[in-house]
Amino acid sequence: MGIFSGGKKYDPDELMKGKLSAASDGLKRPCVSILWAGRLIGWKHPDASIRLAESLKEKGYSFKMTLIGTGEMEEQLHNMIRDKSLEDCVEMPGAMKASEVRSYMEKADIYLFTSDFNEGWGAVLNESMNSGCAVVASHAIGSVPFLIKDEENGLIYENGNQKQLEQQVCRLMDDAEYRMKLGLNAYHTIADLWNADVAAERLIDLCENIIFAKKTKSPYENGICSEAKVMENDWFGK
């Protein structure tokens, strides 16, 4: 398997230090930054983030959620924010340049990836992990089984299971150390394995194996150029 996107090298310590939220809500609790980015369309399910925000606010968490993007659901989402009185904790700044989105990722504590099976890969997962975010992602997204090791470099929830999404995010809200650990591991997954240098090296090695050694099976167990096996839709949790 081999898709990589947006790989950048950071000083890991400086990257994670930048995520130590300086804001407070008056009760001296950290204000956690939560990010969602993409087209505001049905199969990306941005509305799941709004329902999550409602639940977090009801539970008394201090957070700031940002949804970046435009699309057919934009008005609906604005209405949800207004109707649920979430204006103080949810913002929708609209479309942004890729560099601006990356800047938000570099500061975000948690990244939400809520798409369903229509998301063939989802390069935004590479980018958010590369930015050191603790990712909570739907199991249906094409890249998730290849990039995320559940509870090691991110958290996975069953597609469409709002309660499970909320539970996973609450785990990260409650444990800053664990959140930072997942984010740092996510960064190293992309920076050390899913990058252009590794891709070039492995592609050459794979071609030489096929041409000269007549080996048709990839020598790599995971990462770029590893075998992309057919997976059942309900692979998560098995």
Spell out what each predicted region is.
Residues 78-96:
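Nucleotide-activated donor-binding/catalytic signature segment of Leloir-type glycosyltransferases, i.e.
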Residues 134-138, 148:
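Short hydrophobic beta-strand element within catalytic cores of glycosyltransferases
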Residues 164, 171, 178-192, 199-205, ...:
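A short, well-ordered alpha-helix in the C-terminal region of glycosyltransferases
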Residues 23-44, 50-53:
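Conserved donor-binding/catalytic core segment of Leloir-type glycosyltransferases
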Residues 34, 48-50, 65, 165, ...:
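A structural motif in glycosyltransferase catalytic domains
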Residues 106-120, 133:
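Acidic donor-binding loop of glycosyltransferase active sites
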Residues 95-96, 103-108:
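Short alpha-helical donor nucleotide-sugar binding micro-motif in glycosyltransferases
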Residues 150-151, 155-162, 171-176:
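Conserved acidic donor-binding segment of nucleotide-sugar-dependent glycosyltransferases
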